[in-house]
From Swiss-Prot:
The lineage of its organism: Eukaryota, Metazoa, Chordata, Craniata, Vertebrata. It comes from Mus musculus (Mouse). The gene is Hgf. GO terms for molecular function: chemoattractant activity; growth factor activity; identical protein binding; serine-type endopeptidase activity. GO terms for biological process: cell chemotaxis; cell morphogenesis; cellular response to hepatocyte growth factor stimulus; epithelial cell proliferation; hepatocyte growth factor receptor signaling pathway; liver development; myoblast proliferation; negative regulation of extrinsic apoptotic signaling pathway via death domain receptors. This is Hepatocyte growth factor. Belongs to the peptidase S1 family. Plasminogen subfamily. The keyword Transferase does not apply. Keywords: Disulfide bond, Glycoprotein, Growth factor, Kringle, Pyrrolidone carboxylic acid, Repeat, Serine protease homolog, Signal. Potent mitogen for mature parenchymal hepatocyte cells, seems to be a hepatotrophic factor, and acts as a growth factor for a broad spectrum of tissues and cell types. Activating ligand for the receptor tyrosine kinase MET by binding to it and promoting its dimerization. Activates MAPK signaling following TMPRSS13 cleavage and activation. Residues 1-32 form the signal peptide. Residues 38-124 form the PAN domain. GO terms for cellular component: extracellular region. It comes from the Eukaryota. Residues 129-207, 212-289, 306-384, 392-470 form the Kringle domain.
């Protein structure tokens, strides 16, 4: 009986061990994948930096590797008793990694510059805050909350204990630093050097509280790297598990350091992509500052009568969009549901139904009271006056000699002398080098849309500068179409109302879809480029991963068209010149031209089309029917001159050289929501061309109200310049 009593625990232990072994064997593949996932997100990166040590006894390990990711994985595994990796340097040119048991905060260690080196430091060892219970904290705080110095972990004086470094490997019980080896409530703690106080917690703040946020957190640059549900953030310079466009080199002013929470696109608060493949992104839990003290450079200038910059500081009472349609109240969900509410954007002054720019769009805007037009810009609000000095330009700015050296997207201009080879590629004359000073905005190629400059960003090789025309120097009105014309031929959804179904020969027509839902039309002008309206992408920092370009389809609902359709991702947006309402979409890969997919020609620059020329618009938009069939439709319009167009609009419209007017041949036909971005196609000398782009109008196909389109011929040189220079 005694023998059986002794044997029972042994048998029980064997049973438990066998059960654990079976569990180990049955670990799913997904968990194994998780263990092998990239660990670079656990490190803080310092570009072009290396470490030098004064103590020759400090060991360094080195090995040739393929990438910084491999360096990180090996560093995390190097947590032995004699060597614990706290940082590494990756030599990009030699593909070599150097692992260090110290970091930049260690005594006798200095940072140094190295063009080919990138320093990565394990954030657990350098952060001055904790996440959750602080079980991963490995910082150097060694004072308790009440100010008592901590007792070393390997000492038994004045308090005996069992928390020995050898018993808690991996918990970094070094020196007398505060730790939480068991992950207990209260956070990191230590035994104290006071015989009367055995142990006490340390005063280490939560990472969510180290830096508070003001407004919606657009200027937040704190160290929070977990979402509000506890998911670890994905690094901004990584594309796995989620592909995105917010690359640090593309947006140098957005603070895309490592994997910290940020708000680059006007969301209600900071967020990040997550390492969970099933959760693309989540918000982060960051406290709001008690006082709205914020860097003055981050605060837009408040105006009430005009727009400064992109109008983020506009606080006036204009409450209609550019064509007179009243705005929907921000606190209303009718007729359009949305999340840009006064509660979510408390500091954006979303009062009443006034035009505002809460999300960093191109200018103030609002949801409209028209159920068929979701969003409209308030472009009738004038720009604030610019001075008549060197910070404005006349004509097309070819004689501008100011000192501005930043693009409209905030990128610093690149030196002209480093870009002369690229400049010679798209102009046919020798530029005046005396005007190309340093990296100042200039117009050496006689661009019709103003000064510009090259950038150091390969994704945005060049862009226009935020300089306005001088006061009194306005865009000229379009010529009367009765005069001789230059030949165009070379040797929210808007919908076509009451159009007739088209044939399948319009292979240049593109359906732009967001999460599989049609939102806009577009025109395939080159195998890799689509021309559409910027209203389809109102925020400059729009994430493109949920957008697709569908080509070769006649039925937007995809019925019976699986064989001929092509579905392509969008890799880049290129916004048109200021006020153009155009955007070019770079496709992730070129379209394959066949019987169902083709390109449409562009008109010659500056050409005009004769009045009364019959043209056509195409779209999948609103048809006036409750159960729309989803078929591509066409409506025929005729070109209308400036004077007649103005009469139909009760004298409220005066066309300029960037606009085109066309009226319906059939009463009640015209563009409506769902057709935004689609083309106005005209034929001249047996050549079909995209002469106009559909942009929001006043209502849908209103009788005797001709539509106003973006005149593509006015922007033809810009389109060709982008296609020639945007290579990535």
């Amino acid at each position: 009986m005694m023998w059986g009593t002794k044997l029972l625990p042994v048998l029980l232990l064997q049973h438990v061990l066998l059960h654990l072994l079976l569990l180990h064997v049955a670990i799913p593949y997904a968990e194994g994948q998780k263990k092998r996932r990239n660990t670079l997100h656990e490190f803080k990166k310092s570009a072009k930096t290396t470490l030098t040590k004064e103590d020759p006894l400090l060991k360094i390990k080195t090995k040739k590797v393929n990438s910084a990711d491999e360096c990180a994985n090996r560093c995390i595994r190097n947590r032995g008793f004699t060597f614990t990796c706290k940082a590494f340097v990756f030599d990009k040119s030699r593909k070599r990694c150097y692992w260090y048991p110290f970091n930049s905060m260690s005594s006798g260690v200095k940072k140094g510059f190295g063009h080919e080196f990138d320093l990565y430091e394990n954030k657990d060892y350098i952060r001055n805050c904790i996440i959750g219970k602080g079980g991963s904290y490995k910082g150097t705080v060694s004072i308790t909350k009440s100010g008592i110095k901590c007792q070393p972990w390997n000492s038994m004086i004045p308090h005996e204990h069992s928390f020995l470094p050898s018993s808690y490997r991996g918990k970094d019980l070094q020196e007398n630093y505060c730790r939480n080896p068991r992950g207990e409530e209260g956070g990191p703690w230590c035994f104290t050097s006071n015989p009367e106080v055995r142990y006490e917690v340390c005063d280490i703040p939560q990472c969510s509280e180290v830096e508070c946020m003001t407004c919606n957190g657009e200027s937040y640059r704190g160290p929070m790297d977990h979402t509000e549900s506890g998911k670890t953030c994905q690094r901004w310079d990584q594309q796995t598990p989620h592909r995105h466009k917010f690359l640090p080199e593309r947006y140098p002013d957005k603070g895309f350091d490592d994997n910290y929470c940020r708000n680059p696109d006007g969301k209600p608060r900071p967020w990040c992509y997550t390492l969970d493949p099933d959760t693309p992104w989540e918000y982060c839990a960051i406290k709001t500052c008690a006082h709205s003290a914020v860097n003055e450079t981050d605060v837009p200038m408040e105006t009430t009568e005009c727009i400064q910059g992109q109008g983020e500081g506009y606080r006036g009472t204009s409450n209609t969009i550019w064509n007179g349609i009243p705005c929907q109240r921000w606190d209303s969900q009718y007729p359009h549901k949305h999340d840009i509410t006064p509660e979510n954007f408390k500091c954006k002054d979303l009062r009443e139904n006034y035009c505002r720019n809460p999300d960093g769009a191109e200018s103030p805007w609002c949801f409209t009271t028209d159920p068929n037009i979701r969003v409209g810009y308030c472009s009738q609000i004038p720009k604030c006056d610019v001075s008549s000095g060197q910070d404005c330009y006349r004509g097309n700015g070819k004689n501008y000699m100011g000192n501005l050296s930043k693009t409209r997207s905030g990128l610093t201009c690149s030196m002209w002398d480093k870009n002369m080879e690229d400049l010679h590629r798209h102009i046919f004359w020798e530029p005046d080098a005396s005007k190309l000073n340093k990296n100042y905005c200039r117009n050496p190629d006689d661009d019709a849309h103003g000064p510009w400059c090259y950038t150091g960003n390969p994704l945005i090789p060049w862009d226009y500068c935020p300089i306005s025309r001088c006061e009194g120097d306005t865009t000229p009105t379009i010529v009367n179409l009765d005069h001789p014309v230059i030949s165009c031929a070379k040797t929210k959804q808007l919908r076509v109302v009451n159009g007739i179904p088209t044939q399948t020969t319009v292979g240049w027509m593109v359906s732009l879809k967001y999460r599989n839902k049609h939102i806009c039309g577009g025109s395939l002008i080159k195998e890799s480029w689509v021309l559409t309206a910027r209203q389809c992408f109102p925020a400059r920092n729009k994430d493109l991963k949920d957008y697709e370009a569908w080509l070769g389809i006649h039925d937007v609902h995809e019925r019976g068209e699986e064989k001929r359709k092509q579905i392509l991702n969008i890799s880049q947006l290129v916004y048109g010149p200021e006020g153009s309402d155009l955007v070019l979409l770079k496709l992730a890969r070129p379209a394959i031209l066949d019987n169902f997919v083709s390109t449409i020609d562009l008109p010659s620059y500056g050409c005009t089309i004769p009045e009364k020329t019959t043209c056509s618009i195409y779209g999948w938009g609103y048809t006036g029917l409750i159960n729309a069939d989803g078929l591509l439709r066409v409506a025929h319009l005729y070109i209308m001159g400036n004077e007649k167009c103005s009469q139909h609009h009760q004298g409220k419209v005066t066309l300029n050289e960037s606009e085109l007017c066309a009226g319906a041949e059939k009463i009640g036909s015209g563009p409506c929501e769902g057709d935004y971005g689609g083309p106005l196609i005209c034929e001249q000398h047996k050549m079909r061309m995209v002469l106009g782009v559909i942009v929001p109008g006043r209502g849908c196909a209103i009788p005797n109200r001709p539509g106003i389109f973006v005149r593509v011929a006015y922007y033809a040189k810009w389109i060709h310049k982008v296609i020639l220079t945007y290579k990535l």
